Amino acid sequence: MTGRARARARGRPPGQEAAIPPVGAASAQKTLPSHPSEQRQSLQPCHPPPLTEEPGGRGRQRGPQDAPKTLGLQISAGFQELSLADRGGRRRDFHDLGVNTRQAIEHVRESKTGSSGAMIKLIANFFRLTSRPQWALYQYHVDYNPEMEARRLRSGLLFQHEDLIGKTHAFDGSILFLPKRLPNKVTEVYSKTRNGEDVRITITLTNELPPTSPTCLQFYNIIFRRLLKMMNFQQIGRNYYNPKDPVSIPNHRLMVWPGFTSSILQYEESIMLCADVSHKILRSETVLDFMYSLYEQVEERRFRDACAKELIGVIVLTKYNNRTYRVDDIDWDANPQCTFRRADGSEISYIDYYKRQYNQDISDLNQPVLISQYRRKRGNVTVGPVVLIPELCYLTGLTEKMRNDFNMMKDLAVHTRLSPEQRQREIGKLVDCMKKDECVQKELRDWGLSFDSSLLSFTGRVVQAEKILQAGNVFDYNPQFADWSRETRVAPLIHAKPLDNWLLIYTRRNYDAANMLLQNLFKVTPSMGIRMNKATMIEVDDRTEAYLRVLQQSITPDTNIVVCILSSTRKDKYDAIKKYLCTDCPIPSQCVVARTLSKPQTALAIVTKIALQMNCKMGGELWSVEIPLKQLMIVGIDCYHDTLSGKQSIAGFVASLNEKMTRWFSRCVVQSRGQEIVDGLKACLQTALREWFKWNKYLPSRIIVYRDGVGDGQLNTLVNYEVPQFLDCLKTVGKDYNPRLTVIVVKKRVSTRFFAQAGGGLKNPPPGTVVDIEVTRPEWYDFFIVSQAVRNGCVAPTHYNVVYDTSKLKPDHVQRLTYKLCHMYYNWSGVIRVPAPCQYAHKLAFLVGQSIHREPNLLLSDRLYYL
């Protein structure tokens, strides 16, 4: 089973894996069963909890939700609440604004830029935000006497004095922001309520904020989202989409909404808007359509469980107001005929509510309802849960079956996988629309703000391509493609492990595939230097128990590796095999789906990759690049959440064992929710140092940690807690042991895009492009690298943030080393997007979180058994 196929088979949550038959089965005549063995009985009206004009439900509560964390900026709870609504969820990246790590790294305080490499002209998806001279944002606190609870009322009373405060303002019920300063520091005004009650309003100046203050940065983002709403963009999650410009793909019953991601932050020289293209994929089938389709596929007694498995966790879009909700539960005891209490105390059925409120007719009166634990506050009241009618909800996203449909993905890519020139054109449309919209321009003028009309241009660098070293041979590769599979195909490996005693397990229907694999392995292994005997071939029934029984009976202490030919990508069978061979009976294993061997024209290429994988899993070494630094240990860490319980976090920890970076120590930390993952990482580091000493007879003098899996808002915790824990761990190794430590945070999910200017057009920057100016952050020692090549669409850079460094290595050296390590991932004969130890750590954590669900046996720790 190839890594890519395995990721697709296992890498998505259960709610995304349904096979979707033809849609349109729903009709008023059909009835979904309420219980496995009986049709729904007539229901008495049910009474969900009272809510304000949003139908609430009787869904089972799944425990209290986590309260939103307070932002690290001193604004107000109300302003945070306002910003959450306008920002599209919790923008945890604002927590990282106050983390200034560069000042503590002495050798980069003055300059963090490198100089090696050839210059390249680049354009980035950034627009400068400018403000008028001496611009400031004025922050006021507003008090009411007597106290007014409702935010809408507080706003109405304050806005009676727009002659004083002006029409340009942002108010959250407590904090008022103005683009001008009021005449007095404290201003008292009086307003009247509708019933004639006098209210004294005290407006007190609390802050005069410069353009670069963290509060202003947050404020800019809120104003920008206000502008998007003015242009009729629809907020879905964090991003904004244009429902009036949809792209229809009728032959696949899909709709694509174009949209944008956006963020305004302080960068090296200026405050800038980073805008990128985003697409929302909608399906033209409703949840009810899907339920009826599923009902035709499964046994009646399993129907409700199947619905829960497929729908809980899925995001749906309501057809009446284009809002998205997460399905948290299905209430089979309610239906559209049930009633709920409105804010005025009157009762209304869901049928009547949706007809009066949205002019939506509900045809199936016996369908169950969906429950969304909608987490949003109105004033001091938490709104939720929300009841949704399946018939009125469209499904979003793609199922696993859709993702495996080559023609569908090809047709979808035409609209979503944009070339650099297409992407630049689409991003430019955003600012063009803003320029043409008079309301938007007036809002910006009133605040004293404006955006550049052209994208940011600057100069980057392209470092030289690496030479691939393989058993005395040196290979160059085409740097434009960053792939050396052809060049190294006939060369022996650095260290080839023999296939003396190995098992090949297959089913009767897959005998031909097993035989083809064996014959082709005999063809490709000699040039690699792999000595190979014929496998012990064992036929089994196509059942999980049969595979496990054969494994238990056939594996001996001399077995090198087990190869299993599987009929399909069935996750339960794969998981059972991997769990047994990674924990109970530790031995390297290779699973291959039979159909991947079915095409004669690609069989040799596929078997070559399988042979390389098998060699790695047994402890072999494939290739290397020149690493000038000596006595250097590289560590990669990545985190993953267990799919079985959702309550475990898994950290993959991978550390180099030799100076050539060709052998790795791998270990996993499985932590329950609430436990600190770093405690387990300390133990991993101690064990890795012991293993390094066994291999080299000395300890490393430098340790560089590449830390992936750090979410937005977690940077402060990593710097102030995780890094000190690593330092404490090193002290326990020995009194005189004081290696130089570097910790680099790796971030793949970035909106930044670079376009290379070439011959009057734009193309992707070549692999090895480094950017450490303009779009990096002044308070960080950070840089971007474009390491991989892509055939279609736009290449995505990776962001590296050096948060701790006592190495005193020049920025050039850190950047070059990072790029070198992107060549060392043995599951791909080419350059990948992150340093190899990060990808190894990800693969390990992914395998444990998806299939094994416990720590693998340590006897495998010196092999890349998880590739």
Swiss-Prot record:
InterPro entries: ArgoL1, GAGE, PAZ_dom, PAZ_dom_sf, Piwi, RNaseH-like_sf, RNaseH_sf. Residues 561-853 form the Piwi domain. The keyword Transcription regulation does not apply. Keywords: Cytoplasm, Developmental protein, Differentiation, Endonuclease, Hydrolase, Magnesium, Meiosis, Metal-binding, Methylation, Nuclease, RNA-binding, RNA-mediated gene silencing, Translation regulation. This is Piwi-like protein 1. Residues 1-70 are annotated as: Disordered. Residues 1-11 have a biased composition (Basic residues). Residues 28-44 have a biased composition (Polar residues). It comes from Gallus gallus (Chicken). The active site is at 638, 676, 708, 842. Its main location: cytoplasm. Residues 485-621 are annotated as: MID region. It comes from the Eukaryota. Its cofactor is Mg(2+). GO terms for molecular function: metal ion binding; mRNA binding; mRNA cap binding complex binding; piRNA binding; protein kinase binding; RNA endonuclease activity; single-stranded RNA binding. Its EC number is 3.1.26.-.
